[in-house]
Amino acid sequence: MIIRPVDEVRGELNAPPSKSYTHRAYFLALLAEGESTIENPLVCDDTLATIEAIRSFGAGVDGKTVVPPEEPSPGFVYARESGTTARFSTALAGGIGGKTLIDGARRLRERPMDGLVKALKGLGAEVDGFSLPLTVKGPVKSGRVSVDASKSSQFVSGLLLLGAEVGLKVEARNPVSKPYIEMTLRTMEAFGVEFEREGFSFEVYPGVKGTRYKVPGDYSTASFFLAAGALYGKVRVNNLLREDVQADMAFLDALEEFGARVKRGRDYVKVEGGELKAVALDCSDFPDSFPILAVVAAYAEGRSVIRARQLRFKESDRVRAMAVNLSRMGVKVRELEDGLEIEGGRPRGAKVETFNDHRIAMAMSIAALGATGPSIIEDTESVSKSHPGFFDDLRRLLE
């Protein structure tokens, strides 16, 4: 795809539904007593993988309606490229008698599963393998577990869902991306799950109630459009609730640190450009924002440092991917173990790679809009992983 620079970006969009909440709602509907309706679900490659997964466990899915089985049954889960699908399915398989096989695409086979596997083994499940493909044979025999969550909060969220299935005490050690755990808990509450907590130690009681659940808008995908407003003009994104706990709400604070003007409405966010200055940021609790924050840093005056310790375990090695692409655009970048040091300026048009990573594709598309010449973004089809309509929305802002 060729993207040419523009003079400004102005407009208004509706945020797509949240991918993270959609995943959680479908898995809870699998475990529920009674039928559930998932309103406003995100339809993308990752959430389709989750729908296929809950079907393999015995759920009936007809559009937005989920009819749970009397008891989930073992089966085969192919998670495509969805880490959430793979990890939640692995955890829930621990509560099922019989063997479940979980597998995924090549990059997903490289992503960490070890913390979750060790936790399930500690609960008495039989698990063959520490990365995909792996088999899980339940049911678990113990009701208390401590999990190393330093590589992914999804290990914790998966065990919380297992707790809603069988009852469980879960202690999360060194958790990253903590807001995603809060999102899991909030969705559990919507499905009537009862739990107690002290910090990041939880006691979850079994029992999930079928419900009608409306998926909120997605701050994560909205961040790319809001960044375009900060860099090139003014953008408003609707369907973003102020009273939410999504991880990427912190992206708005980061934009303000850079110097952008941010207005938070009850159900919208508006961002307008300002004089952008370099910042030092740790986005370990909202790592999905790292690629687009690196782009903002490339246009900000001065030297920024953007960090997040789990970045190398995502759909791509996002530290390396952004270092390669920004360097091709003439940006001075130094790669750190857990992030990037970026000297801001005016990127030039270039041919860049997406590394088959949806967030790299989206971030570099926004970067290209302000470059000194046209850019070629390779393999943009990866955006279908989280927002198939991304480029349609971007064109609306450029009309």
Curated annotation (Swiss-Prot):
GO cellular component, one term: cytoplasm
Domain of life of the organism encoding this protein: Archaea
Alphabetical list of PROSITE patterns matching this protein: EPSP_SYNTHASE_2
Main localization, broad class: cytoplasm
Binding site for 3-phosphoshikimate: K19, S20, R24, S152, S153, Q154, D288, Q310, K314
Pathway linked to the protein: Metabolic intermediate biosynthesis; chorismate biosynthesis
E.C. designation(s): 2.5.1.19
Example of a GO MF term: 3-phosphoshikimate 1-carboxyvinyltransferase activity
Active-site residues, Swiss-Prot/TrEMBL: D288 (proton acceptor)
UniProt-listed Gene3D superfamilies: Enolpyruvate transferase domain
InterPro entries: Enolpyruvate_Tfrase_dom, Enolpyruvate_Tfrase_sf, EPSP_synthase, EPSP_synthase_CS, RNA3'P_cycl/enolpyr_Trfase_a/b
Binding site for phosphoenolpyruvate: K19, G83, R111, Q154, R318, R359, K385
Key words of the record: Amino-acid biosynthesis, Aromatic amino acid biosynthesis, Cytoplasm, Transferase
Catalytic reactions of this protein: 3-phosphoshikimate + phosphoenolpyruvate = 5-O-(1-carboxyvinyl)-3-phosphoshikimate + phosphate
Subunit-level organization: Monomer.
Record-given protein name: 3-phosphoshikimate 1-carboxyvinyltransferase
Taxonomic source organism: Thermococcus kodakarensis (strain ATCC BAA-918 / JCM 12380 / KOD1) (Pyrococcus kodakaraensis (strain KOD1))
